[in-house]
């Protein structure tokens, strides 16, 4: 089957990009590709044949129909207007046309210098490409909206960061790479007609049902806000901290995008800061809902030329509604509740307080809770708490709440185990795969990708255990 590519972004939004070709790496070679995703997209296996060189995965060739561009956008970074940004090392190669008429961006990260590289070198490093590939695939299999990773290429090109590292490329796929920052760019350039063109593009291709509706812009922004709310709720329930929620890292489609200094909670710490460059804690775990609203307010500002203020405020209210509703639903599922009762939040917050005091492992606590038998006062989870009396008191109230519903243990446990993962991408697991890959051993990279495809399956090995002490102290930065 021949892959078909279109160039809607290039054809319809000429002010938003610079056309250019990728700059290949030295002795580039394919070290991993997403076989499952490739099969779903009917990508010929021959394209992954290492004897053909790095090919499209290393920017050495293009597939028929590809028209590469680097996109321009701006944004607020750490709450401060940063001006023009853009694809400083990534190139949108083309948009794959799928059988249902939708498209999928093929975006090559680490593809070389662009007009938007600023002081950078246009490169990505092996460390960061591995982290992003693992994180985006982990999030996908957790059921959280995200970009996808298709391939990783390594090379003999040295790249200087804090130390000298290995140049690499990642093929990232997404329904769209449209960001809040695209709209900010033209708003601050005082070109509202181009802001409106971006909105028209989004509606035409992603919400075509609203094209001929008079209030299409208001409906569209409401949906952007609601999707953002649901996304943040998913992050909070699974214990994911993005690390760098700048407006240029926010997706119009409500996707998790731009994996940099992210982290999944190990010990439950609501103030967890994943990014060691975030000295003020702006992007700490428990501040993500507020930051997302702030970012939506910045996007709303760009839409004032063609959406009424009242409509924008209603949309921002939709964010709060979507966030709280989805978060509440998901947390009740994690606790095994099938109905909503007025004291559920009290019970949840009491558990969080216990976990915070004890430094309980976030993922393991909820996974172990999902094995609870409501008639049994004993639980393996009890042994993980130092203050057994406090846990016992909470656990008695929890079991009493379970008994208010006519749901047997098997059904409830089944529901809980579908939403409480046994496996998340802990930083130490990613680092172990990176360390091996930097020594030329890709086995752990491949193994970890396979493990992350089944996050809701119990395991009795390193992948499901608490991290070693050194693994809790890993510092992650934006220096990708």
Swiss-Prot record:
* Induction cue: Barely expressed under standard laboratory conditions but expression increases to high level under multiple stress conditions, such as nutritional deficiency, H(2)O(2) stress and acid stress. Also induced by heat shock. Induced by metal deficiency. Expression is significantly increased after entry of Salmonella into host cells.
**Effect of substituting residue 248 to A:** Does not exhibit inhibition of motility under iron-limited conditions
Query: Which keywords label this protein?
Result: ATP-binding, Magnesium, Manganese, Metal-binding, Nucleotide-binding, Nucleotidyltransferase, Stress response, Transferase
Under the heading InterPro entries, the entry gives: adnlytase_SelO (IPR054838), SelO (IPR003846)
The UniProt PTM text for this protein says:
Auto-AMPylated under high ATP levels. Is probably auto-AMPylated on Ser-479 and/or Ser-480.
Task: List the Pfam families hit by this protein, alphabetically.
Answer: SelO (PF02696)
Q: Name one GO molecular function term.
A: magnesium ion binding
Its family remark reads: Belongs to the SELO family.
Q: Which HAMAP family match?
A: YdiU_SelO
Give the protein name, as stated in the record. Answer: Protein nucleotidyltransferase YdiU
- Report the source organism: Salmonella typhimurium (strain LT2 / SGSC1412 / ATCC 700720)
UniProt lineage:
Bacteria, Pseudomonadati, Pseudomonadota, Gammaproteobacteria, Enterobacterales
Gene from which the chain derives:
ydiU
């Amino acid at each position: 089957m021949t892959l078909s590519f279109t160039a809607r972004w290039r054809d319809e939004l000429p002010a938003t990009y610079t056309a250019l070709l990728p700059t290949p790496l030295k002795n580039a070679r394919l070290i991993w590709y997403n076989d499952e995703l490739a099969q779903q997209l009917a990508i010929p296996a021959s394209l992954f044949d290492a004897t053909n060189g790095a090919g499209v995965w290393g920017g050495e060739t293009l597939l028929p129909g590809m028209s590469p561009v680097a996109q321009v956008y701006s944004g607020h970074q750490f709450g401060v207007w940063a001006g023009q940004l853009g694809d400083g090392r990534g190139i949108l190669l083309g948009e794959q046309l799928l059988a249902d008429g939708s498209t999928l961006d093929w975006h090559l990260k680490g593809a070389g210098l662009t007009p938007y590289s600023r002081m950078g070198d246009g490169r990505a490093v092996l460390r960061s490409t591995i982290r992003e590939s693992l994180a985006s695939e982990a999030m996908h299999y957790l059921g959280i909206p995200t970009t996808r990773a298709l391939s990783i290429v390594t090379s003999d090109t040295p790249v200087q960061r804090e130390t000298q590292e290995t140049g690499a490329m990642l093929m990232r796929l997404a329904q769209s790479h449209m960001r809040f920052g695209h709209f900010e760019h033209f708003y601050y350039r005082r070109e509202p007609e181009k802001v409106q063109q971006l909105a028209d593009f989004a509606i035409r291709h992603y919400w075509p049902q609203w094209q001929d509706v008079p209030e299409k812009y208001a409906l569209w922004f409401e949906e952007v806000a609601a999707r953002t709310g649901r996304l943040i709720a998913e992050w909070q329930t699974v214990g994911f901290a993005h690390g760098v929620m700048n407006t240029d890292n926010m997706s119009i489609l409500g996707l998790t995008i731009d994996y940099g200094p992210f982290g999944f909670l190990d010990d439950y710490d609501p103030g967890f800061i994943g990014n060691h460059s975030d000295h003020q804690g702006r992007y700490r775990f428990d501040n993500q809902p507020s930051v997302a609203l702030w970012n939506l307010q910045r996007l709303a500002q760009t839409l004032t030329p063609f959406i009424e203020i009242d409509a924008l405020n209603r949309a921002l209210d939709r964010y709060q509604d979507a966030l709280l509703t989805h978060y509440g639903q998901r947390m009740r599922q994690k606790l095994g509740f099938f109905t909503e009762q007025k004291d559920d939040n009290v019970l949840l917050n009491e558990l969080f307080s216990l976990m915070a005091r004890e430094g309980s492992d976030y993922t393991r606590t909820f996974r172990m809770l999902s094995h609870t038998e409501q008639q049994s006062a004993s639980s393996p989870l009890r042994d993980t708490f130092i203050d057994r009396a406090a846990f016992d008191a909470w656990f008695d109230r929890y079991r009493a709440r379970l008994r208010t519903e006519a749901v047997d243990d098997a059904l409830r446990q089944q529901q809980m185990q579908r939403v409480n993962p046994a496996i998340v991408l802990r930083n130490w697991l990613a680092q172990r795969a990176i360390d091996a890959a930097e020594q030329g051993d890709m086995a752990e990279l491949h193994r970890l990708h396979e493990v992350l495809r089944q996050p809701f399956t119990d395991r009795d090995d390193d992948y499901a255990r608490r991290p070693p002490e050194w693994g809790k102290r890993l510092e992650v930065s934006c220096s990708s």
